[in-house]
């Protein structure tokens, strides 16, 4: 059964379409109007092994906040939809990602109990034209809408680009593990409750 989903969301601030295949090969087409954000989402798709299409048109004449946060919302919703009740998956995933002087770790529980622990610090307020505070907004929106409990922590690192990118890669690799089909579940939700 294909684990794909498409979600469209339109507000007065943004118009977004996201399509994802959880069992893809990491091919992506990303267009948000924010170059560095596109780069991060491309990295997320590649290292997660997800085929991903993102088309976002946002009110960038105001700032990048709505575009970044709302794209996180819709991406999270698409993953939640593609998981179809979280049946048969491994549920848990974790990753350590080094990027030159930076080391970031991420642990995920696809529990349908969304939560974000964010221990990431940036030494500069911007990377490219993007405000670094928006990375937390993305991850929070993504967690709340995907049903994921995410713990993301940069253990050390100086370069702002590396800190941001290692975070997206760590999220991708941890999520890749968590969404994997686990034959031991017999197609059931991996919980003593029987549902997630």
UniProtKB/Swiss-Prot annotation:
Catalytic reaction(s) noted: D-erythro-1-(imidazol-4-yl)glycerol 3-phosphate = 3-(imidazol-4-yl)-2-oxopropyl phosphate + H2O
Catalytic activity, EC: 4.2.1.19
InterPro entries cross-referenced by the UniProt entry: IGPD_sf, ImidazoleglycerolP_deHydtase, ImidazoleglycerP_deHydtase_CS, Ribosomal_Su5_D2-typ_SF
Cellular component GO terms held in the UniProt record: cytoplasm
Subcellular location: Cytoplasm
Entries under Pfam families matching the protein: IGPD
GO BP terms in the entry: L-histidine biosynthetic process
Protein name, as recorded: Imidazoleglycerol-phosphate dehydratase
């Amino acid at each position: 059964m294909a684990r794909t989903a498409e979600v469209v969301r339109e507000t007065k601030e943004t118009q977004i379409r996201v399509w994802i295949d959880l069992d893809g090969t990491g091919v992506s087409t990303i267009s948000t109007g924010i170059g560095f954000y596109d780069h991060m989402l491309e990295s997320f798709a590649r290292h997660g092994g997800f085929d991903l299409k993102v088309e976002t048109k946002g009110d960038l004449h105001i700032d990048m906040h709505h575009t970044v946060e709302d794209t996180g919302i819709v991406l999270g919703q698409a993953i939640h939809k593609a998981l179809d009740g979280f049946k048969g998956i491994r549920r848990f995933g974790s990753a350590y990602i080094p990027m030159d002087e930076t080391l970031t770790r991420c642990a995920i529980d696809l529990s349908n109990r969304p939560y974000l622990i964010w221990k990431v610090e940036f030494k500069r307020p911007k990377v490219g034209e993007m405000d670094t505070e928006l990375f937390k907004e993305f991850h929070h929106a993504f967690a709340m809408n995907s049903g994921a409990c995410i713990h993301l922590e940069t253990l050390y690192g100086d370069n702002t680009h590396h800190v941001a990118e290692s975070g997206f890669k760590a999220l991708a690799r941890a999520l890749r593990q968590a969404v994997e089909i686990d034959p031991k579940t017999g197609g059931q939700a991996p919980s003593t409750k029987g549902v997630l």
